[in-house]
Amino acid sequence: MGQKVNPIGLRLGINRNWESRWFPAKERTADFIAEDYKIRKFLKKELFYAGVSNIIIERTAKKLRINIITARPGIIIGKKGADIEKLKTTLVKMLGKDVAINIKEEKRPQASGQLAAENVATQLERRVAFRRAMKKVIQGALKSGAKGIKISVSGRLGGAEMARTEWYLEGRVPLHTLRAKIDYGFAEAQTTYGIIGIKVWIFKGEVLAKGIQPEPAEEKKGGRRPSRKRGE
């Protein structure tokens, strides 16, 4: 049974950068990791409806800078910047240090792996059929310029007695090609039948040196793996 490594971690230093950017003293490393987790958990919960695709944390000797990439920057900023100031005050009180917040707009939200996974999760929680939810997100990603997308859902799909995994694939998603720019996202849907896990891989093209042409490859359409029961 094949296991998938996280495609973002696999490409760190090749075509992806770290989401926590700091160099602490050895004894402070664990504290900073725990603090970063606390910040991300708080912001994802507080700004869920703003469509936050990524949170990048940078630290200097005296300052903490949080870069929030979002599909709806206006919701976070608020009228005349009132909401972002309120958010900053809450973070300063929670962390006990000076915090700077930068808001960046997600140019193509439908081609973001994290937002696509959260979109499917939201639809499943609203009792939309899982196949319909997956196909809708796939169509949106391809219209936004993605070259390929794969979505996997696992759990008691449709209220079935046995948990299973199903996935759809459109276009190309070359997970073994390190120069491929793969965006990955994971989300969980809290349904009445239990938790359903959603994973999304989106292929946005290849990062190549100047003068090098990508090799032509055939596109797959409508790929779908038959359902598989857990434990087989």
UniProtKB/Swiss-Prot annotation:
InterPro entries: KH_dom (IPR004087), KH_dom-like_a/b (IPR015946), KH_dom_type_2 (IPR004044), KH_sf_prok-type (IPR009019), Ribosomal_S3_C_sf (IPR036419), Ribosomal_uS3_bac-typ (IPR005704), Ribosomal_uS3_C (IPR001351), Ribosomal_uS3_CS (IPR018280). Pfam families: KH_2, Ribosomal_S3_C. GO terms for molecular function: mRNA binding; rRNA binding; structural constituent of ribosome. The keyword Cell wall biogenesis/degradation does not apply. One of its GO terms (cellular component) is cytosolic small ribosomal subunit. Keywords: Ribonucleoprotein, Ribosomal protein, RNA-binding, rRNA-binding. Part of the 30S ribosomal subunit. Forms a tight complex with proteins S10 and S14. This is Small ribosomal subunit protein uS3. The lineage of its organism: Bacteria, Pseudomonadati, Campylobacterota, Epsilonproteobacteria, Campylobacterales.
